[in-house]
Amino acid sequence: MKRTLIQNAVIVNEGRKVLGSVVIEGEKIAEILTGEEKTTTPCDEIIDATGCYLLPGAIDEHVHFRDPGLTHKADITTESRAAAAGGVTSIMDMPNTNPQTTTLEALDEKLTLLAGKSAVNYSCYFGATNNNYPQFAQLDKHRVCGIKLFMGSSTGNMLVDRMASLRNIFGGTDLLIAAHCEDQGIIKENTDKYKKAYGDDVPLTLHPVIRSEEACYRSSELAVQLAREANARLHIMHISTARELDLFSDAPLITKRITAEACVCLLYTSPSPRD
């Protein structure tokens, strides 16, 4: 089996940077050497990484590979190759495809496609609906990375808007629940208001006004409340307001059942309308 030595790199891993070397055997990391440590086994290829950073393959837990059904946009082959080219070696695919990944049959179809076409490691989310929570018990955590829950409308029309269904979802699985949180009632009220003023030609600049800070906060607040009641594992995707941060604990990550993330682009925007 081929052994490759990448030496003299600045290794970035788990929040630390150290000068060292890495030995790859076949497709797996065999040794991580720090400082002046040397491997004792000969290597077939030696790469001098002086002045370079060496990072482990990244995990992207929120991808839209558009396959099946939306491949006029992209597909598993093109997107997984793009991921690999960018240093992303593991992905988790979202369920708002066509058909939606909301049944066990659709899940099997998605996983079969990924197995045959993906250039990187993969898993996928199972999409929640108002009535499919009985299927959660049949999901294998080694095949499914979590339940995707749309608490606000988005691409794919997968909104879950019944309180009874939400309680069944949060109380019906030990899998991570990855939630898209925007209050649909507030969105609808704002949409109706601006459609009265502009008809069907509502300016794009009003997007952050329609999907407002209040809409984000109220939905995230509800998700956190339901997760606490059920002791569910909740992760809120792409929060977009500073106000939402008050909903989360700053306890050590390993102890948390409720977490959140922000997209980097959202750190550079404001809710003010813009051209």
Task: Cite the ranges covered by each PLM segment.
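Metal-associated gating/positioning segment near the N- to mid-region
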Residues: 52-117
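Active-site metal-binding motif and surrounding structural segment of the metallo-beta-lactamase
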Residues: 38-54
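Histidine/acidic-residue-rich, glycine-tolerant segments that coordinate divalent metal ions
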Residues: 97-108, 113-226, 243, 267
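Hard-cation-handling environments
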Residues: 240, 249-254, 259-267
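Short catalytic-loop micro-motif centered on adjacent basic/acidic residues
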Residues: 93, 123-126, 233-238
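N-terminal metal-binding scaffold of metallo-dependent hydrolase/deaminase domains
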Residues: 1-41
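Conserved small/polar residues in nucleotide/adenosyl-binding loops
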Residues: 268-275
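Histidine-centered divalent metal-coordination motifs
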Residues: 62-66, 180, 238, 265
